[in-house]
């Protein structure tokens, strides 16, 4: 599968353009996910054929901040993408996750509930 970066709660247009320009030389596909699709399985949003869409449409609150989900990245490419995002000047982006065999069945609300509350549990 092709490297894909899913972006939930996309920032304003100027910041989004900075992100796109940073990823372009790396040939990384950026996909902005609409709020109405927040109940879809992450694997489906990433393009995994074994996942089907849900018929539910999300109409709740937006995430508190942008969240990046890195899909199908090898370690060195993940490092390159993270470095490009740091240098682009659109951040900081506190919420980043990697698609795994476990979380590909979740939706972004489940991911964000676990991911965003993690720093709180460490304190």
Residue spans of the language-model regions?
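Short, flexible, solvent-exposed loop/turn segments with mixed acidic/basic and small polar residues
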Residues: 1, 55-61, 86-88
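N-terminal, charge-rich interaction modules
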Residues: 1-50
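Gly/Ser/Thr-rich loops at beta-strand to alpha-helix junctions
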Residues: 9-15, 38, 73-77, 102-106
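A generic structural motif
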Residues: 29-41, 92-105
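Short, structured active-site "lid" loops
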Residues: 45-65
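Mid-chain, well-packed structural core segment of small domains
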Residues: 59-85
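Short, compact, well-ordered microdomains
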Residues: 80-87, 96-109
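Single conserved hydrophobic/aromatic residue that forms the stacking wall/gate
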Residues: 114-123
């Amino acid at each position: 599968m092709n490297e894909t970066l899913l972006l939930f709660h996309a920032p304003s247009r100027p910041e989004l353009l900075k992100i796109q320009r940073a990823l372009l030389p790396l040939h990384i596909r950026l996909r902005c996910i609409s709020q109405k699709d927040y109940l879809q399985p992450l694997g489906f949003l990433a393009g995994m054929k074994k996942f089907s869409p849900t018929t539910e449409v999300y109409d709740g609150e937006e995430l508190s901040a942008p969240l990046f989900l890195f899909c199908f990245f090898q370690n060195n490419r993940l490092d390159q993408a993270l470095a490009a995002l740091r240098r682009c000047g659109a951040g900081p982006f506190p919420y980043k996750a990697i698609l795994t065999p476990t979380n590909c069945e979740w939706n972004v609300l489940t991911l964000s509930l676990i991911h965003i509350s993690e720093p709180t549990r460490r304190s």
